[in-house]
Amino acid sequence: MSELKDCPPLKYYDFKPVDHVKVCPRYTAVLSRSEDDGIGIEELDTLQLELETLLSSASRRLRALEEQRQILTDWQDKKGDKRFLKLEKDPDLAASSRHSKPKKQKLDVKGSHGPGPGPGRPKSKNIQTKVQDFEFEVDPQDIPRNPKNDAPNRFWASVEPYCADITNEEIRVLEELLKAPDDEAEYYKIPTLGKHYSQRWAQEDLLEERREGARANDKKKSMMGPLSELDAKDVDALLKKSESQHEPPEDGCPFGPLSQRLLQALVEENIISPMEDSPIPDIPGKDDGAGTSPRSQGKAFSVPHTRSLEARIREELVSQGLLDSDERQGVGGESEDEVLAELQKRQAELKALTAHNRSRKLELLKLAREEMRKQELRQRVRVADNEVMEAFRRIMAARQKKRTPTKKEKDQAWKALKERESILKLLDG
């Protein structure tokens, strides 16, 4: 009974079993299936988490049982040490016991090789126990290991920057984003319309023919030199003239589409007799019989200031509400330039998107500055909380010593409370 009294107190843990149905529903469902059903790939992650839960529960049980077993082992070793010391203090008792009970001594010596205590064993056991204690303190099971499935850790690590406090560096980045870029005006420029492909091709064809003729007539190069220069000058003059006229339509009418539509609306129908019924007037020609060229005929019908007339008609129609103001027109008053219309459409969308982004950035900057102010107030609240707790500890220490708090301590406590209350009002406001 005395030995049982010396036994250190043991903890009888009440191990609560893991409810597989609630904690591990997927694991329970897989166990209830037949072998033919198998396990799906999408179930592996859930099964891994549930198996890790069961493993951690089993590890906790094993660690608790190992702790209690170690307590019993240490107690048994200490009891053996006490017997050994008692025999050393009473050698006569040890000698008489050896003479009176030789067989039992032999049995004890033989048994000393077993788990029971013996006269020569406790010291080695004590050393082994100390080694075990030392190893138990640095047991690798106690060292936290990274879980195999670190998806939650990676998720919170990715979310943490969005939940952290706003810094001055982030405010500066927002202010930099609000500045207009240097090349913003480049996106709203409309490039000038180049030469029409027919004009460019005609010029290229003429130049190609001239080069081929020059190669074919190397011997007559000196004779044809002045003429070729004159031809080049004529070609350049014709091209410049066509560019100045902005390529009038094939029918030779110098007026724009709006002017033509307006005149067609003002002219009454069926007032002109058919061409086959009207007599053809005689056109006096020159004696040499040379007819006029289409280019010379176009000169007779050329009217100056047609572009300004087209623009003025458009303005009047828009002001009278007969024409939409957002109708796009191309170069020369033509509204059939699809490339220009698409370019202007995309530029308008870009302007709207830029304005929307700028408004959102301004709103975000305003909210960020407001949050910075609140962060400073929260920091002041934490400082005020510490001051209130310090004053509370002083008052409680005075009461424990059965003395009344001094006026200074009370004033400090009231001051800390009022300051904290004022900061909270600012934070709520």
From Swiss-Prot:
One of its GO terms (molecular function) is transcription coactivator activity. Residues 86-132, 208-257, 274-308 are annotated as: Disordered. Keywords: Coiled coil, Nucleus, Transcription, Transcription regulation. InterPro entries: Histone_AcTrfase_su3 (IPR019340). The keyword Coiled coil applies. The keyword Nucleus applies. Functions as a component of the PCAF complex. The PCAF complex is capable of efficiently acetylating histones in a nucleosomal context. This is Transcriptional adapter 3. It comes from Danio rerio.
